[in-house]
Regions:
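Conserved AMP-binding/adenylate-forming core of the ANL superfamily
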Residues: 35-81, 85-89, 106-111, 160-163, ...
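Conserved AMP-binding/adenylation subdomain of ANL enzymes
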Residues: 215-340
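Conserved pre-ATP/AMP-binding loop-to-beta segment of ANL
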Residues: 31-34, 169-196, 203, 226-232
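AMP-dependent adenylate-forming
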Residues: 22-47, 153, 201
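Structural core segment of the AMP-binding/adenylate-forming
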Residues: 22, 93-167
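A short helix-loop-beta submotif of the ANL/AMP-binding
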Residues: 73, 79-99, 103-107, 115-121, ...
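ATP-dependent adenylate-forming carboxylate-activation enzymes
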Residues: 78-79, 99-114, 126-131, 259-281
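Conserved AMP-binding A3 loop
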Residues: 46-50, 192-218
């Protein structure tokens, strides 16, 4: 049955073979829909699908201008932000492969993954650039380092991400059609991502995922949980996480919906404090979580309910029971006798 479902989904969207196709489809269907929300100057600012694609094209051109060839690997070490999406999609448009890195990695772990993957370039946010400077001499394959929102002057092999965008714009004007030619060469069996295991029991393994892998996962998740185009998600899971990556970034993109990043602040602790504050600002329709985090959410919610008295607690428990019966497995709305409980 599983293979039949995958085949049926592929036939339904037969022109979707790559992650690039997912963005192109949404830019065609939902050009003015907001895709990304990012907090700047104290307020969440929107970027539409057409605006995102323009930035992606500039990144692709900038990467090609510095010599990125099809199949080259680019490591990405950053908290979730607009530039994370621009960077990954841009390097994919240029035919590259992303090597997303967890922001929780130690310097030694970063060195292993970058060198093992053979990444030629590195995109890093300003918050983690000092970590990279400490191990720069050990990153033997890295030729250029692009810094997102640098707080200090960058020089040498360090280049600001904004400079990558502006140089890409100039390069596109001087080389019309070259980015489009590279884009057309990307196929579903091309490598899109090398996702490393944690390495808790042995050396980390690089899981090689193709464009086709991601597209099939997006279509399968969409068949289970429908995401209307007006939906917003506040994506507080690490963006290199495979769940957040597939469902948060790409499933929402496929449906013309939008995702918001958490305001990182000045430290990981400030990031955690900003999550509930940003939830009130963004008002997301959906949250993605993992068991440990969901358990903490539930614990805090139920602690607050207990403070409101026994009657409110009874209403909560009754509503929870009704919801479980109505939604069944959680894959769809209640049907049949579930409606009357």
């Amino acid at each position: 049955m599983g293979y039949f479902c995958i085949f049926a989904l592929a036939m339904k969207e037969k022109n979707l073979n790559t992650i690039i196709d997912l963005l192109e489809r949404s830019c065609s269907k939902f050009p003015d829909n907001v895709y990304l929300w990012e907090k700047r100057d104290g307020k969440y600012q929107p970027s539409t699908y057409s605006e995102v694609k323009q930035q992606v094209m500039y990144v692709a051109a900038g990467m090609m201008a510095v010599g990125l060839e099809k199949g080259d690997r680019v490591a990405l070490l950053s908290e979730g932000c607009n530039a994370w999406v621009y960077g990954e999609l841009g390097l994919l448009y240029a035919g590259g492969t992303n090597v997303p890195l967890s922001i929780k990695l130690t310097p030694k772990e970063v060195v292993f993954r970058v060198n093992h993957s053979g990444a030629r370039y590195l995109i890093v946010s300003d918050f983690y650039v000092n970590t990279i400077r400490q191990i720069e001499d050990e990153l033997t394959s890295i030729e250029k380092i692009f810094v997102i929102r640098p707080s200090h002057v960058v020089e040498g092999k360090y280049v600001s991400f904004d400079q990558l965008l502006s140089s890409g714009k100039v390069w596109m004007e001087k080389h019309p059609g070259e980015v489009e030619k590279r884009v057309s060469s990307v196929e579903k069996d091309d490598l899109a991502n090398i996702s490393y295991t944690s390495g808790t029991t042995a050396e980390p393994k690089g899981i090689m995922l193709t464009h086709g892998n991601y597209v099939s996962n997006v279509l399968q998740s969409d068949s289970l949980i429908q995401v209307p185009e007006y939906f917003k998600v506040l994506l507080f899971l690490p963006w290199d996480h495979s769940f957040a990556h597939t469902v948060g970034i790409y499933s929402f993109m496929y449906n013309g919906a939008s995702l918001a990043s958490v305001d990182f602040g000045r430290s990981p602790m400030e990031y955690l404090r900003n999550i509930p504050l940003n939830m009130k600002e963004v008002k997301p329709h959906l949250l993605l979580s993992v068991p440990a985090l969901a358990k903490n959410f539930k614990k805090n919610i139920e602690a607050g309910i207990q403070l409101k008295g026994k009657f409110v607690q009874w209403l909560y428990n009754k509503g929870l029971k009704v919801a479980y019966r109505y939604y069944g497995t959680g894959n769809h709305e209640g049907k049949g006798m579930r409606i009357v409980l």
